[in-house]
Amino acid sequence: MATLRVDEINKILRERIEQYNRKVGIENIGRVVQVGDGIARIIGLGEIMSGELVEFAEGTRGIALNLESKNVGIVLMGDGLMIQEGSFVKATGRIAQIPVSEAYLGRVINALAKPIDGRGEIVASESRLIESPAPGIISRRSVYEPLQTGLIAIDSMIPIGRGQRELIIGDRQTGKTAVATDTILNQKGQDVICVYVAIGQRASSVAQVVTTFHEEGAMEYTIVVAEMADSPATLQYLAPYTGAALAEYFMYRERHTLIIYDDLSKQAQAYRQMSLLLRRPPGREAYLGDVFYLHSRLLERAAKLNSLLGEGSMTALPIVETQSGDVSAYIPTNVISITDGQIFLSADLFNAGIRPAINVGISVSRVGSAAQIKAMKQVAGKSKLELAQFAELQAFAQFASALDKTSQNQLARGRRLRELLKQSQSNPLPVEEQVATIYTGTRGYLDSLEIEQVKKFLDELRKHLKDTKPQFQEIISSSKTFTEQAETLLKEAIQEQLERFSLQEQT
């Protein structure tokens, strides 16, 4: 039998002692006392922050929202069907954050930034907090660059600038999503990153929007964040903040971004559901008292950054649904007071066949003509006033038996202007064509046509102008001004088209 020498034993013991590494891990652990309806109550989590992420034994995550003396109220980021009473919960020590990178462009993701389009994982090396502080006053500069929507009614009378927050408000089925998606389609070639956030919508509706983006080639510069109607309330509540974090990533990289929240009414309802289940005291319309803060901290993140920060921008178009046109309800008034203007879509106009169904009279942009190119200011300056006067005169004409010639001419001009503003869906117009269209209407060139002929005439005029007078588009796009030369070219094209059109009608 071999004998071990003392010095060998000594050497082995020394090596083992040197290799010994005593690590003490401290974990903040609690126990589930109650779970159900997307809410869990936990005891034992003594040191936990508001908004901290927690992890349950079976893998589900949650966010600590209620910190009470006896327990902690957690909202679950999943169905939580496998969570058992008495199981352990671990505090992570982190606030909710998501990975961010250029690789998200062209993808459909959920509120946790996980892909749901079946095209594999997204590789990202950086991450951002879902809730970040908004840029301060010194970090911002005033809005001065236009963000073209491609819709004549908006770009001419309710202009939107890069860094602005413009609310789209109206009843259900009035074309709110169509206005937002057309704006995204119009950003093609404009170097604008778009983020479309779908909150609590039907999966079929979201699929339809994504299909439109693919067909029109818009998906290459767009990210879709989607939480469907069957998603947990927590994820519907988080989805807009996830979208904002992605848009901010590009904004701070000196890029221009556009974010659509479709729609914030459903986010507020998800937050109300969570709050009531957490036994928080309800206020007006059963919403929690801080529902204003829910939306203000989200929308204040939209900004036009100053030159020191790279002049990036984040333009927000939140959508809010009204009931029977009631804009004085709690959520609509809250969001109206936060945003820099609103585009009001009317069910009556929609049903009358005027689409987009924008009520120009009560829609407003608080940035105004600062967000328009000079050419648009020159031709569209009085169009909003003319349309408002037309609406007033039309209401009066219903009761008046006989109108003087001036009033009749004003009514005729107004009807043609309203016809001029009609546009089919997924057909945004470049600003040069908009300038030509508005000039034709406001200068009286459509007065000799029947109302039914206006759309056909304008379509042919735009094509004729593009084919025979390409200099017109070059002048507007390069100088951003409606010069005398541009006006002469446009007048020639209109006269030529009027002659051609009258010959067509005769034959």
Curated annotation (Swiss-Prot):
As for PTM, the annotation reads: Only phosphorylated in mesophyll cells, and only when cells are grown under high rather than low light regimes (70 vs 900 umol photons/m-2/s).
| Annotated family | Belongs to the ATPase alpha/beta chains family.
Q: Which Pfam families match?
A: ATP-synt_ab (PF00006), ATP-synt_ab_C (PF00306), ATP-synt_ab_N (PF02874)
Q: Which residues form a coiled coil?
A: none
GO cellular component labels: chloroplast thylakoid membrane; proton-transporting ATP synthase complex
Alphabetized UniProt keyword annotations: ATP synthesis, ATP-binding, CF(1), Chloroplast, Hydrogen ion transport, Ion transport, Membrane, Nucleotide-binding, Phosphoprotein, Plastid, Thylakoid, Translocase, Transport
Q: What is the recorded name of this protein?
A: ATP synthase subunit alpha, chloroplastic
Q: Which PROSITE patterns does the entry link to? A: ATPASE_ALPHA_BETA
Q: Which HAMAP family match?
A: ATP_synth_alpha_bact
One Gene Ontology term from the biological process aspect of the record: proton motive force-driven ATP synthesis
Q: What is its main location?
A: plastid
EC numbers on record: 7.1.2.2
Q: Specify the enzyme's EC class, one word.
A: translocase
Q: Annotated site (Required for activity), which positions?
A: 363
Against InterPro entries, the record matches this protein to: ATP_synth_asu-like_sf, ATP_synth_asu_C, ATP_synth_asu_C_sf, ATP_synth_F1_a_nt-bd_dom, ATP_synth_F1_asu, ATPase_a/bsu_AS, ATPase_F1/V1/A1_a/bsu_N, ATPase_F1/V1/A1_a/bsu_N_sf
Question: What lineage, starting at the top, does this entry show?
Answer: Eukaryota, Viridiplantae, Streptophyta, Embryophyta, Tracheophyta
Q: What is this protein's function per UniProt?
A: Produces ATP from ADP in the presence of a proton gradient across the membrane. The alpha chain is a regulatory subunit.
Organism, scientific name: Zea mays
Q: Does the keyword Phosphoprotein apply?
A: yes
Give the molecular function GO annotations. ADP binding; ATP binding; proton-transporting ATP synthase activity, rotational mechanism
- Domain of life, per UniProt, equals Eukaryota
Query: Where on this chain does ATP bind?
Result: 170-177
Report the residues modified as Phosphoserine.
383
Quaternary state and interactors:
F-type ATPases have 2 components, CF(1) - the catalytic core - and CF(0) - the membrane proton channel. CF(1) has five subunits: alpha(3), beta(3), gamma(1), delta(1), epsilon(1). CF(0) has four main subunits: a, b, b' and c.
Give the way it sits in the membrane. Peripheral membrane protein
Report which reactions are catalysed by this protein. ATP + H2O + 4 H(+)(in) = ADP + phosphate + 5 H(+)(out)
